[in-house]
Protein backbone atom coordinates (compact mmCIF):
# COMPACT_ATOMS: atom_id res chain seq x y z
CA UNK A 1 0.00 0.00 0.00
CA UNK A 2 1.03 3.64 -0.56
CA UNK A 3 3.30 2.71 -3.46
CA UNK A 4 4.40 5.67 -5.58
CA UNK A 5 5.35 5.22 -9.22
CA UNK A 6 8.95 6.33 -9.72
CA UNK A 7 10.37 7.83 -12.90
CA UNK A 8 13.94 8.86 -13.65
CA UNK A 9 14.58 12.01 -15.69
CA UNK A 10 17.57 13.32 -17.57
CA UNK A 11 19.52 15.33 -15.00
CA UNK A 12 20.96 18.47 -16.50
CA UNK A 13 21.16 22.26 -16.28
CA UNK A 14 18.79 24.25 -18.47
CA UNK A 15 18.77 27.96 -19.30
CA UNK A 16 15.31 29.41 -18.66
CA UNK A 17 13.72 32.61 -19.92
CA UNK A 18 10.87 34.34 -18.10
CA UNK A 19 7.81 34.45 -20.35
CA UNK A 20 5.22 35.76 -17.85
CA UNK A 21 4.96 37.21 -14.35
CA UNK A 22 1.78 37.51 -12.28
CA UNK A 23 0.60 37.71 -8.69
CA UNK A 24 -1.21 34.71 -7.21
CA UNK A 25 -2.21 35.42 -3.62
CA UNK A 26 0.95 35.70 -1.52
CA UNK A 27 3.13 34.47 -4.39
CA UNK A 28 4.81 35.85 -7.47
CA UNK A 29 4.15 33.33 -10.23
CA UNK A 30 6.97 33.25 -12.76
CA UNK A 31 6.55 31.27 -15.98
CA UNK A 32 9.76 29.83 -17.42
CA UNK A 33 10.45 28.40 -20.85
CA UNK A 34 13.24 27.91 -23.37
CA UNK A 35 14.65 25.51 -25.97
CA UNK A 36 16.47 23.51 -23.28
CA UNK A 37 13.11 22.41 -21.83
CA UNK A 38 11.93 20.35 -24.80
CA UNK A 39 12.36 17.13 -22.77
CA UNK A 40 11.71 18.62 -19.33
CA UNK A 41 9.44 16.42 -17.21
CA UNK A 42 8.04 16.57 -13.69
CA UNK A 43 5.50 13.87 -12.85
CA UNK A 44 5.50 13.80 -9.05
CA UNK A 45 3.99 16.17 -6.47
CA UNK A 46 7.15 16.22 -4.34
CA UNK A 47 9.43 17.07 -7.27
CA UNK A 48 11.82 19.97 -6.87
CA UNK A 49 14.12 21.87 -9.17
CA UNK A 50 17.15 23.88 -8.13
CA UNK A 51 16.81 27.39 -9.53
CA UNK A 52 19.85 29.63 -9.74
CA UNK A 53 19.36 33.39 -9.43
CA UNK A 54 21.63 36.33 -10.23
CA UNK A 55 23.93 37.63 -7.52
CA UNK A 56 21.76 40.27 -5.79
CA UNK A 57 24.73 42.67 -5.53
CA UNK A 58 26.36 42.30 -8.95
CA UNK A 59 23.54 40.91 -11.09
CA UNK A 60 25.86 38.17 -12.39
CA UNK A 61 24.22 34.78 -12.96
CA UNK A 62 26.73 32.13 -11.87
CA UNK A 63 25.27 28.64 -12.20
CA UNK A 64 25.99 25.06 -13.26
CA UNK A 65 26.11 24.23 -16.96
CA UNK A 66 25.10 21.05 -18.74
CA UNK A 67 27.74 18.32 -19.05
CA UNK A 68 27.06 16.83 -22.49
CA UNK A 69 23.97 14.56 -22.45
CA UNK A 70 23.56 14.27 -18.68
CA UNK A 71 24.98 15.76 -15.50
CA UNK A 72 26.16 19.24 -14.64
CA UNK A 73 29.44 21.07 -14.23
CA UNK A 74 29.42 23.26 -11.16
CA UNK A 75 31.10 26.66 -11.29
CA UNK A 76 33.82 28.07 -9.10
CA UNK A 77 32.51 30.78 -6.85
CA UNK A 78 29.34 31.44 -4.85
CA UNK A 79 25.97 30.65 -6.39
CA UNK A 80 22.46 31.64 -5.33
CA UNK A 81 20.36 28.51 -5.77
CA UNK A 82 17.04 27.69 -4.14
CA UNK A 83 14.67 24.72 -4.47
CA UNK A 84 11.15 25.10 -5.86
CA UNK A 85 8.20 22.92 -6.83
CA UNK A 86 7.66 23.06 -10.61
CA UNK A 87 4.00 23.69 -11.41
CA UNK A 88 1.77 23.35 -14.46
CA UNK A 89 4.27 21.77 -16.84
CA UNK A 90 2.76 22.22 -20.29
CA UNK A 91 3.47 22.68 -23.97
CA UNK A 92 2.75 26.16 -25.32
CA UNK A 93 3.27 27.98 -28.61
CA UNK A 94 6.61 29.12 -27.21
CA UNK A 95 7.70 25.61 -26.22
CA UNK A 96 7.50 23.64 -22.99
CA UNK A 97 6.81 25.89 -20.01
CA UNK A 98 6.23 25.63 -16.27
CA UNK A 99 5.53 27.92 -13.33
CA UNK A 100 7.37 28.74 -10.13
CA UNK A 101 5.39 30.25 -7.27
CA UNK A 102 7.79 32.34 -5.18
CA UNK A 103 6.46 33.23 -1.73
CA UNK A 104 6.82 36.90 -0.82
CA UNK A 105 8.76 37.66 2.36
CA UNK A 106 9.03 40.85 4.43
CA UNK A 107 12.79 40.19 4.61
CA UNK A 108 13.38 38.55 1.22
CA UNK A 109 16.30 36.36 0.29
CA UNK A 110 17.80 36.19 -3.21
CA UNK A 111 14.84 34.34 -4.76
CA UNK A 112 12.02 36.45 -3.33
CA UNK A 113 13.91 39.70 -3.94
CA UNK A 114 14.50 38.72 -7.56
CA UNK A 115 10.87 37.70 -8.07
CA UNK A 116 9.56 41.07 -6.89
CA UNK A 117 11.28 42.71 -9.87
CA UNK A 118 11.18 39.85 -12.39
CA UNK A 119 10.46 40.82 -15.97
CA UNK A 120 9.70 38.97 -19.17
CA UNK A 121 13.01 38.13 -20.83
CA UNK A 122 14.97 37.67 -17.59
CA UNK A 123 17.11 34.54 -17.46
CA UNK A 124 17.72 31.89 -14.81
CA UNK A 125 19.25 28.42 -14.73
CA UNK A 126 17.21 25.38 -13.65
CA UNK A 127 18.74 22.06 -12.55
CA UNK A 128 16.66 18.90 -12.16
CA UNK A 129 14.51 17.18 -11.26
CA UNK A 130 16.49 13.95 -11.08
CA UNK A 131 13.33 11.91 -10.85
CA UNK A 132 9.72 11.81 -9.74
CA UNK A 133 7.61 9.83 -7.31
CA UNK A 134 3.91 9.95 -8.10
CA UNK A 135 1.09 10.27 -5.60
CA UNK A 136 -0.13 6.96 -4.13
CA UNK A 137 -3.19 5.68 -5.95
CA UNK A 138 -4.50 3.39 -3.20
CA UNK A 139 -4.78 5.67 -0.16
CA UNK A 140 -8.24 5.89 1.38
CA UNK A 141 -7.42 9.32 2.75
CA UNK A 142 -4.67 11.95 2.47
CA UNK A 143 -3.65 14.52 5.06
CA UNK A 144 -1.57 17.40 3.66
CA UNK A 145 0.16 19.44 6.39
CA UNK A 146 1.60 22.59 4.84
CA UNK A 147 2.78 26.13 5.39
CA UNK A 148 3.24 28.80 2.73
CA UNK A 149 6.43 27.26 1.35
CA UNK A 150 4.88 23.83 0.73
CA UNK A 151 1.45 24.93 -0.48
CA UNK A 152 2.50 24.57 -4.16
CA UNK A 153 3.38 20.91 -3.54
CA UNK A 154 -0.03 20.41 -1.91
CA UNK A 155 -1.66 21.72 -5.08
CA UNK A 156 0.12 19.02 -7.04
CA UNK A 157 -1.12 16.35 -4.66
CA UNK A 158 -4.68 17.56 -5.19
CA UNK A 159 -4.17 17.18 -8.93
CA UNK A 160 -2.52 13.75 -8.72
CA UNK A 161 -4.41 11.89 -5.99
CA UNK A 162 -7.35 9.83 -7.28
CA UNK A 163 -10.88 11.13 -6.74
CA UNK A 164 -11.52 8.15 -4.46
CA UNK A 165 -9.03 9.55 -1.91
CA UNK A 166 -10.57 11.99 0.57
CA UNK A 167 -8.24 14.91 1.26
CA UNK A 168 -7.79 17.10 4.33
CA UNK A 169 -5.40 20.06 4.32
CA UNK A 170 -3.95 21.31 7.61
CA UNK A 171 -2.43 24.80 7.33
CA UNK A 172 0.17 25.82 9.89
CA UNK A 173 2.64 28.62 10.58
CA UNK A 174 1.73 31.92 8.94
CA UNK A 175 -0.55 30.19 6.44
CA UNK A 176 -4.24 30.75 7.17
CA UNK A 177 -6.96 28.33 6.25
CA UNK A 178 -8.62 30.93 4.02
CA UNK A 179 -5.39 31.60 2.13
CA UNK A 180 -4.79 27.88 1.65
CA UNK A 181 -8.32 27.29 0.38
CA UNK A 182 -8.10 30.22 -2.05
CA UNK A 183 -4.74 29.11 -3.46
CA UNK A 184 -5.75 25.46 -3.74
CA UNK A 185 -9.06 26.15 -5.52
CA UNK A 186 -9.71 22.85 -7.26
CA UNK A 187 -12.47 20.98 -9.02
CA UNK A 188 -12.11 18.13 -6.52
CA UNK A 189 -13.50 18.22 -2.98
CA UNK A 190 -11.16 18.81 -0.06
CA UNK A 191 -11.41 20.19 3.47
CA UNK A 192 -9.10 22.81 4.99
CA UNK A 193 -8.25 23.12 8.67
CA UNK A 194 -6.07 25.72 10.38
CA UNK A 195 -3.59 24.82 13.11
CA UNK A 196 -4.18 27.64 15.55
CA UNK A 197 -2.13 25.97 18.28
CA UNK A 198 0.03 22.91 18.74
CA UNK A 199 0.46 21.06 15.44
CA UNK A 200 0.33 17.61 17.02
CA UNK A 201 -2.91 18.42 18.83
CA UNK A 202 -4.47 19.64 15.60
CA UNK A 203 -3.29 16.55 13.72
CA UNK A 204 -4.57 14.27 16.49
CA UNK A 205 -8.03 15.79 16.12
CA UNK A 206 -7.98 14.81 12.43
CA UNK A 207 -7.33 11.18 13.46
CA UNK A 208 -4.97 9.82 10.78
CA UNK A 209 -5.13 6.04 10.64
CA UNK A 210 -3.69 3.03 8.82
CA UNK A 211 -5.40 4.07 5.57
CA UNK A 212 -4.11 7.66 5.64
CA UNK A 213 -1.25 8.96 3.51
CA UNK A 214 0.43 11.99 5.10
CA UNK A 215 2.44 14.66 3.31
CA UNK A 216 3.90 17.23 5.69
CA UNK A 217 6.37 19.92 4.68
CA UNK A 218 7.45 23.38 5.73
CA UNK A 219 9.33 24.76 8.72
CA UNK A 220 11.45 21.88 10.02
CA UNK A 221 11.37 22.48 13.77
CA UNK A 222 7.56 22.64 13.77
CA UNK A 223 7.41 19.26 12.03
CA UNK A 224 9.70 17.36 14.44
CA UNK A 225 7.04 16.61 17.10
CA UNK A 226 4.51 15.80 14.36
CA UNK A 227 6.85 13.20 12.90
CA UNK A 228 7.32 11.60 16.33
CA UNK A 229 3.57 11.43 16.77
CA UNK A 230 2.90 9.91 13.36
CA UNK A 231 5.80 7.48 13.19
CA UNK A 232 6.35 6.50 16.83
CA UNK A 233 3.04 7.00 18.63
CA UNK A 234 0.73 5.95 15.79
CA UNK A 235 3.24 3.59 14.18
CA UNK A 236 2.55 4.78 10.63
CA UNK A 237 5.06 3.44 8.11
CA UNK A 238 7.73 5.42 6.27
CA UNK A 239 5.86 4.71 3.03
CA UNK A 240 2.75 6.54 4.21
CA UNK A 241 4.45 9.51 5.89
CA UNK A 242 6.37 11.77 3.51
CA UNK A 243 7.87 14.66 5.44
CA UNK A 244 10.34 17.36 4.44
CA UNK A 245 11.72 20.42 6.20
CA UNK A 246 11.72 23.02 3.43
CA UNK A 247 13.32 25.58 5.74
CA UNK A 248 14.38 25.99 9.35
CA UNK A 249 13.88 29.17 11.33
CA UNK A 250 17.16 31.02 11.82
CA UNK A 251 19.09 28.95 9.25
CA UNK A 252 20.09 30.37 5.86
CA UNK A 253 19.92 28.02 2.84
CA UNK A 254 18.66 25.06 4.90
CA UNK A 255 19.13 21.68 3.18
CA UNK A 256 15.67 20.16 2.86
CA UNK A 257 17.27 16.71 2.48
CA UNK A 258 18.37 16.88 6.13
CA UNK A 259 16.36 14.65 8.50
CA UNK A 260 13.46 16.31 10.28
CA UNK A 261 14.58 14.67 13.52
CA UNK A 262 18.37 14.10 13.57
CA UNK A 263 17.96 11.91 16.66
CA UNK A 264 15.54 9.58 14.87
CA UNK A 265 16.25 9.62 11.11
CA UNK A 266 14.78 7.09 8.70
Label each region the model flagged.
Residues 1-266:
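Extended, composition-driven regions rather than compact fold-specific motifs
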Amino acid sequence: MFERERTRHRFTARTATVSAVETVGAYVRVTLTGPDFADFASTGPTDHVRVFFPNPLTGELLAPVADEEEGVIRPDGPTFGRDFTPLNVRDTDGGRSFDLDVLRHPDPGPAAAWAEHAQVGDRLVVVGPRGSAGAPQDAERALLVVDGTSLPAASRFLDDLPESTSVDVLAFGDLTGDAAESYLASERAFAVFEAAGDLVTEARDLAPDAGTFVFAAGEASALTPLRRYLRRELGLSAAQVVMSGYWRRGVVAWDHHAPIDPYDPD
